[in-house]
């Protein structure tokens, strides 16, 4: 019995000793870098333990404080091609920006003059300070106060020179800041492929022959709208959304909700087959990220484009956040402030997300229903390519990725049996970031108009996809660089983006073009049926 008690006592002493050792070790916490401390807030493990089991590659991905990436506009190129940038502003309907290139040249010239103006006072300040130091040493060594008056004069002169130098330096800094502001405000240069003006160029058709159009084209029926069809079949509910949220929102119900998910999964599947990697991005971003991608809170007509999120008083010091209008914004920012190894290019991502648009402005018959809404699901394609010119190394360029985008869009819309046309968009329709853009529009039967014995096809087309080449516009503003690969010097990659699936618009087009008036059903495109339980037609929901 005594032996057991002694053993228990020894065990307790051992436990106490181990616990004391643990406390002493814990009090001597080793140095942990700031990044690891920040990431530790989300990690239940203590710093020493986490560092012991964390690879160096993971530590490179730790959470960093939110700071806007430093933009690097190509000021040298703007100065060397000022006339081209001025014309580009006019062509792209940015008349107020047309004087910016010349103003940038003037400010840079002024900055150079100021640099020259600084040389004399800085040199004189150095001389005066050396003289002051020499006189001060003499006074200290010899106890001579006769030079005090001279010292006072020299110090006054030095102060005057410093004040003048400070004023010149301040003005030079102002010039530099203004040059950057003006340069970042300029729209991207347009591609030679982009038509100048307001009219797009017709590239071709998908599932449509103008000489032999579908039968419904010859008998326009405004009642054949996706709103009427979707409501009668129990697929769309605008009444409830008007109660819950207001104009511009909707409920997709029954097979309508299934059709939405089928479109998402099908488009993701096609993109993956083409080598694009799936990503699920956030729908809230820092406002400076949206701006760096070329999305302004208001357009050139001062109409609201982006919703910002109101911050509480305790968060006022934090960066403003906004609702993303497209997954293009968070996807582009995945490499903000980072270097991409040249060997990793091209990078091709596809992401489905909820998108939010303020969509300010008038609302007409051609934008009713699902066509223009405030919140919707969209599958977006985004890619980075090297900015080097194609050569013997077979570098994948932005033109290559752009062609890949278009082939994915064409495959999806062709398989959905939607009548489409492909347009090369004009300069006035490019926005700020795009150098080149192609849209694909679907023929909406409800938009057909007849008059004087003819049917107006032009009014029936509605955009469902868009693809853009942004060259280095976004990467310069997001601080994304390429290092290594086919060249030693660092450079800014090109970015491309495009719509794989704008769900509500394509869903609306399927309802209108796939509607069988005689049977009162909508034919489900064969490629979507596997995601809808084999359903071939959508009939009226009896419940």
Describe the predicted segments one by one.
Residues 1-2, 9:
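Methionine residue identity
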Residues 10-14, 18-33, 37-213:
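N-terminal alpha-helical targeting/anchoring segments
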Residues 97-100, 113-117, 206-543:
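TRNA-recognition modules of translation machinery and tRNA-sensing kinases, especially anticodon-binding
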């Amino acid at each position: 019995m005594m032996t057991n008690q002694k053993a228990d006592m020894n065990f307790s002493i051992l436990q106490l000793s181990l616990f004391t050792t643990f406390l002493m070790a814990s009090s001597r916490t080793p140095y942990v870098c700031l990044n690891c401390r920040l990431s530790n807030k989300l990690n239940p493990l203590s710093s020493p333990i986490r560092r012991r089991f964390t690879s160096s590659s993971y530590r490179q991905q730790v959470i960093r404080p939110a700071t806007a990436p430093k933009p690097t506009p190509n000021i040298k190129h703007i100065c060397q091609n000022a006339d081209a940038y001025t014309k580009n502003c006019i062509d792209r309907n940015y008349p107020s920006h047309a004087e910016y290139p010349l103003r940038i040249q003037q400010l840079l010239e002024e900055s150079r003059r100021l640099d020259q103006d600084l040389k004399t006072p800085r040199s004189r300040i150095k001389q005066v300070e050396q003289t002051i130091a020499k006189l001060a040493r003499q006074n200290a060594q010899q106890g001579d106060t006769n030079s005090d008056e001279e010292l006072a004069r020299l110090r006054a002169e030095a102060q005057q020179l410093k004040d003048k130098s400070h004023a010149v330096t301040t003005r030079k800094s102002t010039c530099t800041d203004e040059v950057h502001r003006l340069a970042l405000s300029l729209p991207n240069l347009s591609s030679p492929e982009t038509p100048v003006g307001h009219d797009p160029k017709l590239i071709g058709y998908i599932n449509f022959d103008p000489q032999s159009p579908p039968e419904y084209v010859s008998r326009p029926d405004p009642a054949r709208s996706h709103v009427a069809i979707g409501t009668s079949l129990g697929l769309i509910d605008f009444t409830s959304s008007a109660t819950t949220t207001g104009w511009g929102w909707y409920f997709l119900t029954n097979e309508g909700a299934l059709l939405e998910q089928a479109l998402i999964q099908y488009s993701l599947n096609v993109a993956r087959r083409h080598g694009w990697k799936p990503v699920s991005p956030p729908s809230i971003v820092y406002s400076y990220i949206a701006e760096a991608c070329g999305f302004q809170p208001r357009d050139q007509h001062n109409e609201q484009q982006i919703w910002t999120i109101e911050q509480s008083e305790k968060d006022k010091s934090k960066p403003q956040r906004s609702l993303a209008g497209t997954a293009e914004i968070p996807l582009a920012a995945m490499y903000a402030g980072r270097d991409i190894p040249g060997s990793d290019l091209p990078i091709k991502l596809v992401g489905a997300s909820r998108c939010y648009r303020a969509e300010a402005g008038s609302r007409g018959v051609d934008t009713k229903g699902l066509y223009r809404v405030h919140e919707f699901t969209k599958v977006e394609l985004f890619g980075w390519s090297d900015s080097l010119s194609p050569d013997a190394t077979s570098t994948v360029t932005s033109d290559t990725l752009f062609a890949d985008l278009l082939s994915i869009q064409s495959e999806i819309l062709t398989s959905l049996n939607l009548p489409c046309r492909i347009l090369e968009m004009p300069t006035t329709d490019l926005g700020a970031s795009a150098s080149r853009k192609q849209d694909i529009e679907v023929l909406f039967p409800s938009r057909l108009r007849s008059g004087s014995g003819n049917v107006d096809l032009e009014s029936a087309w509605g955009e469902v996809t868009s693809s853009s080449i942004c060259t280095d516009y976004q990467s310069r503003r997001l601080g994304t660089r390429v290092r290594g690969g086919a060249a030693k010097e660092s450079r800014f990659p090109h970015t491309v983006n495009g719509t794989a699936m704008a769900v509500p618009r394509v869903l609306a087009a399927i309802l209108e073009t796939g509607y069988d008036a005689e049977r009162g059903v909508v034919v489900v495109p064969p490629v979507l049926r596997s995601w809808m339980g084999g359903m071939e037609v959508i009939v009226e929901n009896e419940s």
